[in-house]
Design a protein with these regions (language model features):
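Membrane-embedded transmembrane helical bundles of large multi-pass transporters/channels
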Residues: 1-38, 137-382, 497-648
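Structured non-transmembrane domains adjacent to transmembrane bundles in polytopic membrane proteins
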Residues: 48-67, 73-166, 379-547, 553-572
């Protein structure tokens, strides 16, 4: 008797103890889940070595601010706008609000204002103020400030900027997350009921997987924080990826009950041993695929990869400990609620596929070229607010800013304050000549190069100048993450470096430009690493070169087909999809490939010919694979159908 069989029998004998321990472990898991901070700013995962990221940190240190929002106020008397500004400044974590009254008295008619100044703060019947926060864009403090600002404004006011977008993402995810989980569970339940043989089994499967998901989410406390994408996706992905382990265990238990009639503990002991042997290699390949995400310089990959890999490991442990205990406890109920399966077997399907294998090979060869072409030409977008509903407050405000003031984004230039007045003036003029720049706002542009420092309002000077650095705000007509915006940022950066080699262009659009540059490289690295890792593991498991070549080729073909479909539909994908979908699909489906191949080799060892062995393997595995695959599809499809966040 093997050690694993003995362990399995021990688990079966002490099933009540196992379940009690499982329930008790839920307490720290729930606490850990609640205590784990959720990060709603994707841009915060960019490498800290990037100049744009360093610039944000320097800005916080030098100026006490790292995030800002543009507020558009429509059809409101200037006195009321001034009162609103004062209310904003009283809100905790609002560092400073810059408006026209910081530079001139509001009693001066707008018609008498200098044209440059008027263009910055006024357009038609609207005015704009710049609200600076005392922390970074994704900080809880900045989001709290935006929420409090929204609470005191009416329909005449529109709060735009990245802090508003991040706040809306948080609110939307908090609202939708419980529904994601409910939909995924419901759709998986329906599939399991259709393909299963007992009304109770799907409930037990979902219960055990739900517990393992809670364990996974609870242990995230050791990471400090996880991204909102990780939080939203991991539960559904863990449900789909680990479902097949549960199915394998139950199938093995049913087989061993026939081998050992009247001895359920012995049957379960052997089922645990068989299941562990079957899933250990496939789970290692899945973990390796997800772990490849950790190689990304964009730290979201590491965050997602660690949590997903950890989820698979926890899922395997629960599958060979907690699930057997639950199944044994409820086995009498399982027997009472058994029914005839709607799909008894796949014999006819298997026969059709094997008889016409040449047709499927032809389909593979014919479809390969358009699949690869479509995958390589699928359009990707990097603009985060584009993935959100247009009705959200932040998107409405951004659209209002664009329509009213003809501006989409604001760049910040941080440069040495000791640059000569002549060079500073030349730099400002050159920046305003860059394509798509509407205006540049700095001390020189507002007060002139010859105005003594003593005559500049202290609040404005403190906001734009520190002991060593000076800020210039640059208004751009171009949306973030577009070719025009990226070219504009590059041109401005070249101008700044001409006068200050340590000068920086920072803000939302520069960060998104870096995001595009970083993830383009990461995409290649992750794909190569995940394929290489899985290839090597399969090669070691099967002691063959041809097997990993065949399995990886088939899965990569499926990934290319999947990623090519949006191209032929004319749909743009969010950048996250291009990075993680392939890795997730590779990690999730390699289990099926290993299961089918292992069964084929087993049939060959029994003496069957190649065709008969493939036929037998297909008949034995197809239903389990289809059940798990359709369950995964149903869960992810349900979430995609409901979610208002395109990235999810």
């Amino acid at each position: 008797m093997t050690t694993m069989v003995k362990t399995g029998k021990w688990i079966a004998k002490h099933r009540i103890l196992i379940v009690l321990i499982g329930i008790l472990l839920l307490i720290p898991s729930v606490i850990g889940t609640i205590k784990t901070r959720i990060n709603y700013d994707i841009l915060s995962y960019l490498p800290e070595s990037l100049e744009t990221v360093k610039g944000q940190d320097v800005m916080v240190d030098e100026f006490g601010t790292g995030a800002f929002s543009m507020v558009v106020v429509e059809d409101m008397p200037l006195k009321d706008v001034q009162k609103l500004k004062n209310k904003f400044e009283e809100i905790e974590h609002v560092k400073k609000v810059l408006w026209y009254d910081d530079i001139a008295d509001i009693s001066v008619p707008t018609s008498m204002m200098p044209k440059d100044l008027k263009n910055i703060f006024f357009a038609d019947d609207s005015t704009m103020m710049l609200v600076l926060f005392d922390n970074t864009t994704s900080s809880d403090e900045a989001m709290e400030a935006v929420t409090n600002m929204r609470a005191i404004v009416d329909k005449q006011c529109f709060i735009s900027g990245m802090s508003g977008v991040v706040t809306d993402i948080k609110n939307l995810c908090l609202q939708e997350l419980p529904i994601y989980v409910a939909i995924a569970a419901l759709f998986s339940f329906i599939v399991l009921e259709i393909t299963g043989t007992s009304f109770v089994v799907p409930i037990l499967f979902l219960l055990c997987i739900g517990i393992s998901i809670l364990y996974n989410m609870g242990t995230n406390i050791f990471l400090g924080e996880i991204s909102y994408l990780t939080q939203a996706l991991v539960a559904i992905l863990q449900l789909g990826v680990t479902m097949d382990y549960s199915i394998f265990l139950l199938d093995s238990f049913e087989e061993n009950k026939k081998r050992f009639p009247g001895d359920k503990n012995r049957a379960m002991g052997h089922a645990i041993s068989n299941t562990f042997k079957s899933i250990v290699s496939s789970s290692i390949t899945t973990v390796a695929g997800f772990a490849a995400l950790c190689l990304m310089t964009f730290a979201l990959g590491k965050n997602l990869g660690i949590v997903m890999a950890k989820g698979v490991i926890i899922g395997v442990i629960c599958c060979v400990t907690l699930l057997p205990a639950i199944i044994l406890i409820f086995d009498p109920l399982i027997e009472k609620t058994k029914h005839k399966p709607l799909i008894k077997n796949t014999n006819r399907l298997s026969g059709f596929i094997i008889r016409h294998y040449k047709i499927w090979l032809a389909v593979f060869c014919i479809g390969l070229l358009p699949a690869v072409y479509g995958n390589n030409h699928t359009k990707i977008y990097y603009n985060i607010d584009k993935s959100l509903p247009s009705t959200l407050d932040s998107n409405v405000a951004n659209k209002k800013l664009e329509d009213t003031f003809d501006m989409s984004t604001m760049h910040i230039i941080m440069m040495d304050k000791n640059i000569s007045n002549a060079n500073r003036t030349t730099l400002m003029k050159d920046i305003e000549k860059v394509d798509g720049v509407k205006w540049a706002f700095g001390l020189n542009s507002v007060f002139g190069a010859n105005v003594p420092a003593s005559m500049i309002p202290k609040d404005v000077k403190d906001m734009l100048q520190s002991d060593e650095q000076e800020l210039v705000f640059v208004c751009s007509k171009y949306s973030s993450a577009t070719d025009e915006s990226n070219s504009q940022i590059a041109a401005i950066n070249d101008l700044v470096k001409k006068y200050d080699s340590n000068g920086m262009v920072i803000g939302e659009a520069p960060l998104m430009k870096d995001l595009q540059d970083v993830t383009d490289i990461d995409l290649v690295n992750v794909n190569v690493a995940s394929v290489a890792a899985i290839f090597i593991i399969i090669m070691l498991v099967f002691k063959s070169i041809s097997v990993p070549i065949i399995l990886v080729a088939v899965i990569e073909f499926a990934i290319n087909v999947n990623m090519a479909i949006p191209f032929f539909q004319g749909i743009e994908l969010p950048f996250v999809a291009s990075i993680v979908v392939g890795t997730i699909q590779l990690g999730a489906t390699v289990d099926y490939a290993i299961l089918m191949t292992s069964r084929y080799q087993k049939e060959r060892r029994k003496g069957f010919g190649k065709k008969e062995a493939v036929m037998n393997a297909h008949k034995a595995c197809a239903l389990s694979i289809m059940t798990s695959g359709f369950s995964f599809f149903a869960a992810t499809f349900g979430v995609a159908w409901y979610s208002k966040v395109d990235m999810i």
